[in-house]
Amino acid sequence: MTIEVRNLVKKFGSFAALDGVNLKVDNGELLALLGPSGSGKTTLLRIIAGLDWPDSGEVSFNGEDALAQGARERHVGFVFQHYALFRHMTVFENVAFGLRVQPRAVRKEEARIRARVKELLDLVQLDWLADRYPSQLSGGQRQRIALARALAIEPRILLLDEPFGALDAKVRKELRKWLRSLHHEINVTSIFVTHDQEEALEVANRVVVMDKGRIEQIGSPEDVYESPATAFVHGFIGESIELPVRIDDGVVRLGERPLRLAADGLAPGASRLFVRRHDMLVGPPGTGAFEGAVRHVRNFGPVQRAEVALFGGETIEIDAPRDRELRAGDRVGLEPRRYRIFAG
């Protein structure tokens, strides 16, 4: 099932939740909508599901107008952050629910329903919990059951709204790998919403980065991380250093200090320099584009996170290998291995 969104606009009063969004999701794709709160990602998901309606624009499934259909007719499976399981039903009954409430004309006979539920519980590797109630399950188990229930009706599209947001970090990491593997098995066109960049980069085939109701960039996880298209994407994905610089006569300046950085093709005026923390290489004073003094050092597993006061007035944090053995008071030269400069 392919999904296409064209010029989608949705406002809540004067607030534009979606501002001219265009997007195509390919058949069998696992796509992540990534962005901060208020970026429009959940609003977009709800409109695709038929749970909300745009002020203008088009949504099509395989070329057919989806906005002419209600939520039931769209045949979409939806997984919420907080499971939405029925507490008074067993795991088996929860998964069977969607099949048992289908219109009589399309409802399967009970034996086929039971076979389908067993198949799904095997798929999510929780067949041994069929007779348990939601209160007897862990958070990760509940979310797997919620996903099995969404798949029971054999949806054309699977939508997931912050599916792992209510789980602890260890369980979230386990379920990311599981979801990627499961999607490979079921091959259903799927979209999931998240504000967790690590989750989006690890799970999705493509990532859509959103901010303020607009799409900032669409690309593979590698593309959006290695080649951010805008200052917002660079600042939102990964841990970046951001410095206010100016381009004057082909020279990059931090305050009044010229930096030995290429400025070819950059327009003169105020700009922003972005460098990943781990891309700032540490050397002796005088050896890099920047110089500064180490103020404070903290150890994080294999790296040191050092706070460095630059000779130019700015203070930054860098990540260096532990064997570099930085100490407070050290004077250092810093050379960005990779960097991007954006106007504005």
UniProtKB/Swiss-Prot annotation:
Keyword flag Kinase: no
Chief place where the protein resides: membrane
GO cellular component, one term: ATP-binding cassette (ABC) transporter complex
Binding of ATP, residues: G35, P36, S37, G38, S39, G40, K41, T42
Example GO BP: sulfate transmembrane transport
Domain ABC transporter: 3-237
A GO MF label: ABC-type sulfate transporter activity
Annotated InterPro entries: AAA+_ATPase, ABC_SmlMolc_Importer, ABC_transporter-like_ATP-bd, ABC_transporter-like_CS, Mo/tungstate-bd_C_term_dom, P-loop_NTPase, Sulph_transpt1, TOBE-like
UniProtKB keywords: ATP-binding, Cell inner membrane, Cell membrane, Membrane, Nucleotide-binding, Sulfate transport, Translocase, Transport
Catalyses which reaction(s): sulfate(out) + ATP + H2O = sulfate(in) + ADP + phosphate + H(+); thiosulfate(out) + ATP + H2O = thiosulfate(in) + ADP + phosphate + H(+)
EC number, UniProt record: 7.3.2.3
Compartments reported by the entry: Cell inner membrane
Pfam families per the UniProt record, alphabetical: ABC_tran, TOBE_3
Leading EC class: translocase
PROSITE patterns reported for this sequence: ABC_TRANSPORTER_1, ABC_TRANSPORTER_2, CYSA
UniProt membrane topology term: Peripheral membrane protein
Record-linked SUPFAM superfamilies: MOP-like, P-loop containing nucleoside triphosphate hydrolases
Described function: Part of the ABC transporter complex CysAWTP involved in sulfate/thiosulfate import. Responsible for energy coupling to the transport system.
PANTHER family for this protein: SPERMIDINE/PUTRESCINE IMPORT ATP-BINDING PROTEIN POTA, SPERMIDINE_PUTRESCINE IMPORT ATP-BINDING PROTEIN POTA
Subunit structure: The complex is composed of two ATP-binding proteins (CysA), two transmembrane proteins (CysT and CysW) and a solute-binding protein (CysP).
Similarity comment text for this entry: Belongs to the ABC transporter superfamily. Sulfate/tungstate importer (TC 3.A.1.6) family.
Protein name: Sulfate/thiosulfate import ATP-binding protein CysA
Lineage, opening ranks: Bacteria, Pseudomonadati, Pseudomonadota, Alphaproteobacteria, Hyphomicrobiales
Gene: cysA
